[in-house]
């Protein structure tokens, strides 16, 4: 299965040590990725101004350019907005720029985090957590889409993911055995 179960997500986040130099950033970054489903290039391409207002409040939406240069707006839930605040706080506390045009995700050298480095850091935490599941930004995308499909319609999931066709979205929705049982139980009740 290409999604993280809540217990796996907690295990992954629990191995990120807050005392490590980039631990707070990495925890907020992974949380943000899981709650937005953004692609790796979309995450790494974010500037502070994409997610924060000029008044230093997290935005309700983030506008990203996806595949095919299609622009879409992704709503930020309360957990994603808190992750934004944590990322900006981390940058400020480490002396990284927090102006609107500054990269949200930065390296030790104050440069934009490359997508390869993003994948590497996620892999490092996956190994530390001893998860037996592939863990990439795309796994987080599948996780978000699958969770969203449990509480919203497929057209909503399609729009958030930025898909042109509903058939593309269906690949991202994963059903667990517990969901199948619950669905059949609801059928019996109707």
Describe each region flagged by the PLM.
Residues 1-190:
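Conserved catalytic core of the tyrosine transesterase superfamily
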